[in-house]
């Protein structure tokens, strides 16, 4: 009976862990964002901006919230290593795409990459947050301007694709994409100053709670816990 109660207590008090991937072009401020999150939520501060270099591979960080642990994976955004992103899609619970709202020359490239992320079937039902970073810059586009810029870019792409006889996106795929774009959440942040970072983390906390993905290792743990509890309960009943 002790083991049954102990197992039940551990199950009820354990903190669920969710994986969040941070992606975007190189130079968008992904690592600065992660380090600011670590500084705001952990006892040990993250790296200062002057110590941050280009990410080759990944950086990780973990924060503890009420009943929840968020594990962040900051993935390199250079052209030659973006193909690693898809390897993280199956196991992530949320996606953060960071766009440099101050770099207008690379917005088109950023939207092209973002569009490919939206098309990934593995994360079709995974919460996705678009962050317009570098809001501390006076030349930065606002949240509304970023949203409109992407919508305009996407509309131009659709019109161009319709003129291309090789274009073969099905109605269902197009409808799903249109629905996702319409419901897309865009938030403004300054990873450098920390402005908007806490609201973004709050968004993630709420969304991962409401959109849980059950993975094989989680399922196995639950089955083992249930089986163990059932055996303990059966022993107790037999002795009664």
Give short role names for the model-derived ranges:
Residues 1-213, 240:
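TRAFAC-class small GTPase G-domain
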Residues 216-240:
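Extreme C-terminal disordered tails of eukaryotic proteins encode short linear targeting/docking signals used
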């Amino acid at each position: 009976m002790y083991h049954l109660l102990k197992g039940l207590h551990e199950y009820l008090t354990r903190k669920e862990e969710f994986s969040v991937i941070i992606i975007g072009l190189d130079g968008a401020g992904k690592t600065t964002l992660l380090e600011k999150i670590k500084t705001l939520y952990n006892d040990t501060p993250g790296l200062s901006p002057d110590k941050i270099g280009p990410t080759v591979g990944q950086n990780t960080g973990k924060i503890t919230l009420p009943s929840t642990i968020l594990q962040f994976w900051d993935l390199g955004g250079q052209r030659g290593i973006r193909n690693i992103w898809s390897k993280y899609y199956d196991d992530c619970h949320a996606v953060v795409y960071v766009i440099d709202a101050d770099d207008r020359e690379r917005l088109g490239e950023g939207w092209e990459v973002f569009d490919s992320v939206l098309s990934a079937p593995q994360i079709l039902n995974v919460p996705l947050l678009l962050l317009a970073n570098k809001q501390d810059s006076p030349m930065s586009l606002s949240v509304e301007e970023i949203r409109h810029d992407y919508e305009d870019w996407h509309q131009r792409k659709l019109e161009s694709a319709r003129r291309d006889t090789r274009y073969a996106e099905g109605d269902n795929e197009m409808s799903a994409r249109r629905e996702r774009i319409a419901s897309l959440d865009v938030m403004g942040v300054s990873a450098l100053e920390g402005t908007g970072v806490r609201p973004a983390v709050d968004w993630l906390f709420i969304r991962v709670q409401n959109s849980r993905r059950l993975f094989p290792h989680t399922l196995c743990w639950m089955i083992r816990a249930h089986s163990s509890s059932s055996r303990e309960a059966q022993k107790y009943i037999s002795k009664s």
